Amino acid sequence: MNQPAIKHALNVKRADDFAQWYQAVIAEAELAEESGVRGCMVIKPWGYGIWERIQKLMDAEIKEAGVENCYFPLFIPLSYFTKEAEHVEGFAKEMAVVTHHRLISDGKGGLTPDPEAKLEEPLVVRPTSETVIGAAMSRWIQSWRDLPLLTNQWANVVRWEMRTRMFLRTSEFLWQEGHTAHVDEADAMKETLRALEMYRAFAEGPLAMPVIAGPKPENERFPGAVETFSIEAMMQDGKALQAGTSHYLGTTFAKAAGIQYQNKEGQQALAHTTSWGVSTRLIGGVIMTHGDDDGLRVPPQVAPQQIVILPMLRDNEGDDALLAYCEEIRASLVKLSVFGERIRVLLDKRPGKATQKRWAWVKKGMPLILEIGGRDAEGGLVSVLRRDRLWRQDAKPNFVGQAKDDFLASAATELESIQAALYDEARARRDAQIVRDVTDLEGLKGYFAEGNKYPGWVEMGWAKPTGEALDKVVEQLKALKLTIRNTPMDAEKPVGACPFTGEPAVEKILIARSY
């Protein structure tokens, strides 16, 4: 007997067109929308609520490490960038620049920059803050006693992207950027790796998004960095998403900004600096890691609300008793804790059919949905729908009827179960798509051939070439639309030769298509 077909909430499926599906999830889940400025988005309440959860949880981790929050100017003098040649070259094509401070009428009903109001020095709209924070550090640091100096800021940045996609690559985005200064390389590298581990644990914990951490190859380093480390997540189409980076900057920026200190021997020395950051790109990662053909599925730890209660109102005299019952359940739930916090519950009393509101919340990815009718209220019952177990075999929503008290006793456990299930599902999918039996360039070409619609990642041996030899490999990979993501820190030692150079492999690398 054939199983009945499921009628999914979205009109486009992941398997048919992943890019269109991604845009559909953003629209239907009401996460964000395009604005009147190319490449800039309006983040709607549900999308911003996820970012606020990320902020709250990560800010606590940052402060636990002794890092203090600051705020630095949005506008940075152009001369700050010209002090560090490699850094300015890396960002030059993306910089937005302010040249005037006043507008005047153009005589045609419009406005134009006032020629008399040209700035003496152009101001760059913050693409990242190493230069301006370095200038502040040079004033704050005098002695070894001032180190380490650990700062962070939550801010917006602007990088004028040519090809934009909401949450993944926008001209303006929100992020946190940590900037620290240290007495020597060892202490700075310790901080670089601490931040990397914080990001790894955060991705795999609250975001339920498995990642692989490791150093980037020389050609993929942050402009001006000595070493760049990343966490890489696999999306459901097999592409890699760089979800966070941590950089050891050596004395490069200290030299440019004059960050010096008097060491214990009374001599002047340059500080060693780091920077590290994650952005609203994490929300794009959550969408493409956990979304399905019915919309978004939000891990409970970062969901703005974890449970929604939908009373099935009839516009009759029984509604008051039903609402009172629903409020009683809400009041009981918010006294309970999960993941070290109170459970977040919304009683949705908006007018409209409960079924319509149910599908709106399904598309938003609400972890638990309760539907409660008049008979449920009379019998002390609830109907519970887990977003990660949406469908029954008969293609109907997988509601489970429970006694109210039983649900209250199990609500926290259910949320923990959803969090774990989302991670386990994503981890199993990723692990199944990391290929380790490709050993030469022809095999690489074959794996990423057009017939393989959603290939995963290839892990290969690597001789760690530099200079022209590395450039040659980068061009070979570019022709296949591939990049080296990173060197997995927990990978086994390679055996045999590097497929690109023929020399003995000294480490392993991940090769993938990416966002």
Swiss-Prot record:
GO terms for biological process: prolyl-tRNA aminoacylation. It catalyses: tRNA(Pro) + L-proline + ATP = L-prolyl-tRNA(Pro) + AMP + diphosphate. The keyword Zinc does not apply. GO terms for cellular component: aminoacyl-tRNA synthetase multienzyme complex; cytoplasm. GO terms for molecular function: ATP binding; proline-tRNA ligase activity. It is found in: Cytoplasm. Its EC number is 6.1.1.15. Keywords: Aminoacyl-tRNA synthetase, ATP-binding, Cytoplasm, Ligase, Nucleotide-binding, Protein biosynthesis. Its main location: cytoplasm. PROSITE patterns: AA_TRNA_LIGASE_II (PS50862). Catalyzes the attachment of proline to tRNA(Pro) in a two-step reaction: proline is first activated by ATP to form Pro-AMP and then transferred to the acceptor end of tRNA(Pro). NCBIfam families: proS_fam_I. Belongs to the class-II aminoacyl-tRNA synthetase family. ProS type 3 subfamily. Consists of three domains: the N-terminal catalytic domain, the anticodon-binding domain and the C-terminal extension. Homodimer. This is Proline--tRNA ligase. The gene is proS.
